[in-house]
Amino acid sequence: MSSLPDFCGLWIFAVFGSLGAASLGSFYVTLGYRILEYDYGKKRKILSFREKWRRIFTSPSACDHCGKEVRYPELLPVVGYLITKGKCKSCKKDIPKFFPIVEFLFVCIFLFCFLITKNLPFSFVFLFLCGHLLISCLTDARYFSLDYENLPWIFCFGMFSVFLLNGKIPGINEVYVFGGFFLCFIALFFLFPGGIGFGDVLFAPVLAMIAGHPWWMFFLNASYVPAVLFTIVFRKKGSSIRKTPIPMGIYFSLGILLTFFCKILFNADLLPFSIFSELENPNL
């Protein structure tokens, strides 16, 4: 009986946290699409820097097709999509399924992190990192471009997530990881022109540093193995894999996401990796 209040409290936090996670997912997917519209689209050249960001953050949600403003309860994450049956009430055009999918995934990520770690601050801060990774995925998928303005946010929320999860900030080993990745990627950038973008040179070392030592090895494989496999499967017939552009922002984001998931499971003794145990705890 003594564990009942703790059990109830856990699920109360889980329920209300899920609502916050869905709202955060809705915010970031909307932010990502607005950045595509105002920072990469035609409006980029006709609006001042200040006006552009004012519209990105303050413009009311509206249908992409007819411009009709969306109001509650249609604005509610996931639920709003079900209420409208996936169509705009004004023009009857389809609402992208990507919106409710992202909102639902944010809830799933929050529940996974919170129910395993019981660490509410980490579970929420990690969602902010996921939101900025989502923006990188959207810009790279659409324009093969990684937004440099997004990188400081990824670094800050990534470092904060590591601190909240591990209880300590990255140390000298992570600095070495950053330096090693940067030197390797900058060498590849100059030795093989057109092979990788400069965004990869900047993003990969930061994400590897967030992954930490020895998890950078997992991050590297979790990024490049799917990238190569998906490129081989989905490239145009007859085209060379070397000449096929790869949106590495998507795969780097997937890699760091999987790295955090595995670290969470590893810390909870649900995913034993003997080699990582020895590297992280050399005295054992």
Where are these regions (language model features)?
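A membrane-topology feature that recognizes alpha-helical transmembrane segments
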Residues: 1-284
